[in-house]
Amino acid sequence: MSLKAIIIGAGPAGLVACKSLLENASEEYPFDPIVLEQENDIGGTFRYRSYENSHLVSSKQLTCFSDFRLPMSHPDHMSLESYLDYLRAYAQHFQLTERIKLNCKVINVSRDRFTGEHLVSFVMRSLENPREWDQLVITLRARYLAVCTGLHVLPQFPKIEGIEHVVENQSVKQGSGKSVFHSHEYKNRSQLADKRVMILGTGETGTDLAYEAAKAGAKEVVLCTRGGFLSMPHELNHFEIFGLKSDAEKKVPLDCLITNLAETAYVHPWIERSHIRWFVSDFVIKRVLWLLTGTQAGCNQWVGQLEPHRLGRAYVFLNKSHKAMPYLNRPFRDRNAFLDRIARYIDPPEDSPPQTDFIVDLAPFPSHFLPNGQAIFPLLPKRKDSLRMMGRDVRPEVVIYATGYTQEFAFFDKDSGYATPEEANIRNIAREGDESVGFIGFVRPGVGAIPPIAEMQTFFWISLIKGQVRKPLPPPHYHLLVEDTERIKYGVDHSTYMSTLAKDIGAAPGLWQLWRLYGTHVLVCYCFGAAFTTFYRLVGPYKSASAPGVIRTEIWDTITRRGILGNMIMGVIPMTFYLTLNTFAYGAGLVYSFFGGHIE
């Protein structure tokens, strides 16, 4: 008898969940997965919320699934269309398409009170009118349920008093287009050309749209931020040190820089619990950024600085959409000419004088709009962008909410006791006592990508179902450090989370084990490489024959691109420091245990 598994959503998480369940079916667990997707194609948010010129800011090396890679010749960062092509090829290669049911909207999920099985009810899109749904309700019975609907579901619109006045003042203009909308409705530059544009939110989408507006020929662009952001380029190659420019052909993706050894592998529980690795990393990076770019706020970031207690990778999601920074920095950049001759960050020529002197103005969120459509900004004395905007008459013709999304699980029957991702207390994947429901893809890394995390989460969930997860699970130390008042609490450190899941399921390789099985080359790659999912398929229950080849070629390339100096600064030095720190901790732990202490 098959064990039916229903997967809701055919984005990257749903696809990898389906593929992994198929591959790990056995006599005892004959998984028979199907995927229900309410849209007419796969891809999820990458398909239906994309726009012209949009690219992934996570690298192909990290984003691609562990055993289905792009060619070495492919650019490091994919356009959204390229990524959708990749997902289609993935589904075809692993024969998932026959298991994906498109145009199926899940309307109710309840439990059979006698068997505990999940009853998943859905309707299909009407053939006569694709905007409507058929009345016929179809119900399937499943032993397992994977919820893969994603983090980006319902657009969020923070309330701003008087925003309707922008609409009223623009409605008299014929053919002017929509004047207030969410970022998911933005599709191309024609929506911004020759307009006064205001963008609310400084996440990656917000800053990307600010750049798009500048390049579209907008008359004015105002980018509004609540509390600032931390800007870093998605690849490192635009530096000049003592007149020597970095090699433009050897770009290093930012998400491939964090090393494994002693940062995520062989970390003592005391060190892990203290997060000292994150704090030391932040301390060093701030000083290096000051030396190279003149500011600690971010990489070549002269405005929009976060509060000191939130400035660092331990606290926030890095904003890797860096293209707008030359336009934002222009009124604020003030660096000593002598220091600039020692080291500097090189802005792209096409975004610099004499090609352009356009400015994107940074401002606080408006407190309200006047009846004439003018935005009123609060005075924040500690913020230089706020001081600069005081007295400015800003009357946007277009306001874009780049304010993120919330999640909704209206299909869960209220009387059936289903959890939500916030209540998934087993590694943010399942709730204790209800392991048959897995939430895949509901965490977001500070630096990294959700698709490879979804792959590791699926491996963990399958191991959990089969009773193959280590017990008891150690306490989690992978969450970003956020305050209780923060809206988003699902942030994780990519490397720490991936490594934790790998250890939980017996997929984290040992150094001696790696050398014995695969030799020095793979061992060095593991030590100096980032937390790629492929590393966790060298040993353990999800071992893959393709993993060593991927590591010896593609992942090795990310290490050699750094060069000798880069591997010293980003590899040997931090590795030596953390190894020393962990060695002392293990030594102290032995003494502590000898005298009867217990280490969690």
Protein language model features and the residues they cover:
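Extracytoplasmic catalytic/substrate-binding loops of multi-pass membrane glycan-assembly enzymes
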Residues: 57
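Flavin (primarily FAD) cofactor-binding/catalytic cores of flavoenzymes
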Residues: 1-53, 69-483, 494-600
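Catalytic cores of eukaryotic secretory-pathway lumenal/extracellular enzymes that build
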Residues: 64-67
